[in-house]
């Protein structure tokens, strides 16, 4: 049901309830009606929408719920505005009100899609509000792995979905460029620069073994210049003894590589925030001092502890170890203070499920500061791991990273790049990257975040209905082909279709397809409210299925203009919604396949 129709029907039902309540209790009686909730019945035979308001009000009004439902329906159907919207109403079970919409109400979605085009499904209900969405936030110690890819897909699609409701969305990447891992990166690069490789005597135990380290060392020795998208260029000095210069070069090199990974994946950020800046600007010390002054800490065994149990944690946590270094959640607290100070009252973090333990600590630290941050800030979406399969076997390593599969590997393999071709990226064309990006983005968003995901490369390469992204894209391409044929055979352009006689669309398949189109706006609202971007992929697969059912049941290109143009109008509206949904996922909508 279209949102406008839903709002109208809710208002009509609320007015009907008020009329009945006044008739039963008197116009002056105190009465608070519950909010009207409309749901689509699970069984199509039960109508298009169902409402349980009679069951909610029977006791307060002192009447039988089924009799009350009959009175509400009588009041509803007597209203002129309802007569063009509701075709039939019936009472089911103990008092459910089941309504069947008129054919015109169902067909109205086609005109709405034509009128709104790419904006169909979007809303401005949250206009003026802003959201900070933090995702990926990888250490700059190697290429992005498939877990980062899942975060990138979840974050980018969720940002699109939230923006569709009118929010101004700020995409942020938090670089963990301070700590032990960065030191390990520096000594790894230094060892490679000295001619060592994994397994050699003198190779550091904590070093990274991927071939990308050798690439960094080579460019450092050659005096190459590298730059991340938001930073100053850094030139390799070639000095193998200058560990600080090596560290700066290696971090910038890998930030540039991660930028390239994200570019290949079609993901852009509004801001990159460096963990190191929290230290250089004194924000970590300031946060710790504020918690000490607030009485949220205590000293024990030479360490500084945070009273996280005050906020529901199972035990208190160390903030500053006996050696004077901070535990990893302390800069996270300082970082989230900056989010609050920048005016972001709604913040969503997308992280791996292994970060679950840090949630209570960060929230406890923020509450302990007593600066007005609400409980439950920030929101979190936690995702589980991704397993990559190829030829029936799990893929655990790649030439790029040595110990894990990278996002770029996954994109190139899913686009059809041959095994080993990733070592020669110049041989991989843009079409391969586009196919791969589409497959990876769609696949990684096609399951709920809190479920483990098996990414099957062989399935991503299939060009049949088993491959969900192919299935949806093929529906779009097939409609484009039909509309092109409509133009060439009958000289009917898509621009003429809004004038079609939609009363021709009465079949069960046409009705089901129109109802699915009308669900798109509510689906987006639900996905935004529940932080559930997978709902878009679920919807698109269902919509493609409804299209195929309709197309297989009814011929579109017939000589009789009335049914032909009506069916073509339905296809054109379906094509637009498929395009809109694919754009929400950051996936292309090809006109030919």
Curated annotation (Swiss-Prot):
Q: Where is this motif: 'HIGH' region?
A: 138-148
Q: Under which EC number(s) is this enzyme classified?
A: 6.1.1.19
Look up the record and report any one GO term of the cellular component aspect: cytoplasm
Q: Name the Gene3D superfamilies for this protein.
A: Arginyl tRNA synthetase N-terminal domain (3.30.1360.70), HUPs (3.40.50.620), Isoleucyl-tRNA Synthetase, Domain 1 (1.10.730.10)
- Tell me where in or outside the cell this protein is found: Cytoplasm
| Primary location | cytoplasm
Similarity annotation: Belongs to the class-I aminoacyl-tRNA synthetase family.
Name listed for the protein in its UniProt record = Arginine--tRNA ligase
